[in-house]
Amino acid sequence: MWIADGWNDYEVIDCSEGEKLERWGDYLLVRPDPQVIWNTPKTHRGWKKMNGHYHRSSKGGGEWEFFDLPEQWSIHYKELTFNLKPFSFKHTGLFPEQAANWDWFGDRIRNAGRPIKVLNLFAYTGGATLAAAAAGASVTHVDASKGMVAWAKENSRSSGLENAPIRWIVDDCVKFVEREIRRGNHYDGIIMDPPSYGRGPKGEIWKIETSIYPFVQLCTKLLSDNPLFFLINSYTTGLAPSVLTYMLSTEVASTHGGTVKSDELGLLVTRTGLVLPCGSSGRWESGK
């Protein structure tokens, strides 16, 4: 398991009865987590003194309840700054477990010894974009949500990366990749964080179990002659790490060599010292 253990401003304090107690900077949040099927005692004071609590509804969705929580605040990871604000379906605008991947591809970029172009697809609020840019890459950031791209730009300014070579694109990721292929553009690194389910601007349906493999095949056409890495993230329990390994092995390593590794991502739980699973990642990297 790849554990994001480099945080100072974030921690999972405890988890029990379908919820996790987290510290985001100076504030405590309680949010639902489907992986938390145990009912260990909730002894930490934060369970009763949280600043925000997302209550899931039996009808689907849910709502936030706030206790002295600002509308927006920020936390830091190494040289990066992220602006947080609770919004729909329990989210805050950041997935802290992804820091394990930021460190991995950041090291690859810094040690490449050449200019690196990175494509970040389904790029959300830009955690991976900023990590790649801070490591020295030129990044193309693509997300279908105008609001998410605006949030990512805000994070870039807060991180002092407003002048970094980042291209911000609001577009359907599949359509964008198809156009980039026609344009003849290529990238040394590709990152994708696809949703389990989604709809495109013209009603196109994205279902990860049936859409991800042809999309990976499509994206390989954008790899440069000397690619550096390819990263796939999945929060869908049906896509085991071994599935990600198989895809990257057949579609990337078969052509470019290198190595493929896939594993769960995790966050340490302070109270127990155990690890909370947070999805999976598949990594291909060149042997160069």
Labelled PLM ranges:
Residues 114-124:
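Conserved class I S-adenosyl-L-methionine
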Residues 146-148, 170-174, 187-218:
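Mobile active-site "lid"/loop adjacent to the S-adenosyl-L-methionine
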Residues 145-191:
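S-adenosyl-L-methionine
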Residues 5-22, 29-96, 103:
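Non-catalytic substrate-recognition/targeting regions of SAM-dependent transferases
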Residues 227-288:
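C-terminal catalytic and target-recognition region of SAM-dependent MTase-like enzymes
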Residues 218, 223-230:
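Short glycine-dipeptide loop
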Residues 138-143:
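Conserved SAM-binding motif I beta-strand of class I
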Residues 125-137:
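Conserved SAM-binding loop of SAM-dependent methyltransferases across substrates and taxa
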